[in-house]
A protein has these predicted regions:
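Vicinal oxygen chelate
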Residues: 1-2, 45-46, 82, 91-134
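Short, solvent-exposed interaction modules
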Residues: 70-96
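Conserved active-site tyrosine of GNAT-family acetyltransferases
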Residues: 19-24, 94
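N-terminal beta-strand motif that seeds the catalytic metal site of vicinal oxygen chelate
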Residues: 1-20, 75-84, 133
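Intrinsic, low-complexity N-terminal interaction/targeting segments
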Residues: 31, 37-39, 44, 55-68, ...
Length: 134
């Protein structure tokens, strides 16, 4: 598998609204609209930064994986997303290497098809892989 580049960095927060205000006041950064990602039970906003984006993620319900993440680890860095040429090929290669994934089938993400590598394979860092829609 060959990584093309870093697509985005995910930051998990309690309040998108408050975080967007803070990032605007501190850094002059502006996000697009807040979107609801029902399949992941979160709300998100993307802030473009040249070649990559920041994805701000807010739990959409108290029973979501995102809420559990905040309770266990607090707000902050959630994941790093690497772009790959072919997500199905990347999944196949990782499975052959006995690397566990959160989903063995590509999921539909905001910018393309995605999967996540189980963090115990990557020094406890959550890594998202994405085949970007071209």
């Amino acid at each position: 598998m060959r990584v093309r580049n870093v697509n985005h960095i995910g930051i998990i927060v309690r309040s998108l609204k408050d975080t967007l205000i803070t990032f605007s006041e501190l850094f002059g950064l502006k996000a697009g609209k807040i979107i609801e990602l029902e399949q992941f039970n979160v709300k998100a906003a993307f802030i473009p930064l040249n070649e990559i984006s920041l994805e701000l993620i807010q739990p959409a319900s108290p029973n979501s994986d995102a809420e559990r993440f905040i309770k266990e680890r607090g707000e902050g860095l959630h994941h790093i997303c690497f772009e790959v040429e072919d997500i199905k090929e990347a999944i196949g290669e990782l499975k052959r290497k006995k690397i566990k994934l959160l989903s063995e089938k590509p999921l539909e993400g905001v910018g393309g098809m995605i999967t996540f590598i189980q963090p115990d394979h990557t020094n406890n860092a959550l890594i998202e892989l994405m085949e970007k829609i071209r």
